[in-house]
Amino acid sequence: MPDIKLGSLFDGIGVFPLAASRCGIRPVWASEIEKAPISITKRHFPDMVHLGDITKVDGGKIPPVHIITFGSPCQNLSLIGNRSGLAGAKSSLFYQAFRIIQEMRDATDNLYPAIAVWENGSYVLKCIRRVMNRNQLCIAPP
């Protein structure tokens, strides 16, 4: 099996890396700022590099990965949130993931990442189509 590598943004407790590792995919790095979740991820993946604050990560300078996963903050997207969408103070961090993906693509001649997986609430479908089209990215049909 090829060595498929994964990077996780807004990593939390490392659910994406854990699931991926059970499928033979190797988690390489993660970005998270909360200490408690990082301690859990370090226990499961002691060799995974922790990049810290997503706003300070340069996607062109980190190790390229085949897959980038992210579950950006949903406070402004959720049913109980204020529904200000991707313009909201917390949910707008979503754009940091897109920036990192684009920086990595630019640095690798569009080879990496091959796949980006975003997890969030159902309201996000109303916000995302415009962003995906603007960035020439595909989206699964509803």
Features from the language model and the residues they span:
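Conserved active-site and SAM-binding loop architecture
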Residues: 1-142
